[in-house]
């Protein structure tokens, strides 16, 4: 039997905070901080300063590939961070780390594919809360390992830092996280965003020290055809965050390389049962998800499983069964397609414009399945048109009310359609069901353009669930 390692943040009652900081260690964690297609970052900590090196090789060709030259760290340190670059896209690697104090660890990671049509899988694993229910947390993690995804995504509440009674409790909580996920962290790239229990608003929290990420709060992650918008929903700042999110959603919506836009964050805007959805997110973020056609929104926080009916066209999935105490859910609510209170994780099978999900209990039993299809209707080139600049609107009528239209008219307005700018026939662009129109952005536009589409023969309109598609204009040069 494999020897189990306790990832101990050594804690003795007589030690102060500074002493704690000198006596903890962590396992190796693989995350993406740069381009997921060609890089990965490995990070870990030791009790004492040491030098370290990393060796790695393509797992599928070990005989022909001798592996890259090991990367060495010249200066002794307690924290070791290695970013491996120039990797092959869509490849599984084995790695070994060594430090001069005798520590050796081995694990695996995967690089994202360069080909957007290359299939892959990922698992969603949320809400351990430091293994409050250790047996459940270990069982769910073992299930993730058995499912063998290419990487793991998490919307947080990994530990219970916020509600720990003292510093020793914080240490113990993270220690349980590492203990429960020991095999999972060694087997996969683990890409989290913070939950409220992780204390992301506290710059001195372990969240900021443990995870090497593009940003500790909000960041963008491109994996194959998916653009993940990883968002911190803990400290909500209303208009300023919404403005940033609108720009990122527009970039994704109008980028031809992005097939899927998937926001992922901790608190759910919609949840039915013992823990409800977040009203601030419904006010500020949900209208943006609708306007810019988010393909799927992932959250946790409510400890159970809820696959919602599409709300204004947007599918929402709440998965919080990673090991915290379970909450009751309401499977009969009209917003809910399927819900249950169970420990679980979710496997996503990505293949081009289709994602199939399987919600699984720790033993691998699939209790819910669903299929999603990428849903983008409108693209604008350039993505942020400037005043006086010529731009093109492409409208995909397939699957919508204008699918069979003999002619489609572009109805374009300034800001919230408080002034009509354009009402012109669109042209077919050679792709079935797709129409284009080119125009120059008037100088009178202050903030954004608004689009909807019209079939003049039948008198049928298409906007986005009573909200017009948006295009923020570029800032003044």
Give the location of each predicted region.
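Glycan-association/targeting regions that enable binding to alpha-glucans and other polysaccharides
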Residues: 22-49, 59, 374-477
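Bacterial N-terminal signal peptides
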Residues: 8-18
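Structural motif
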Residues: 36, 223-224, 311, 351, ...
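Bacterial N-terminal signal peptides that target proteins for export
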Residues: 1-7
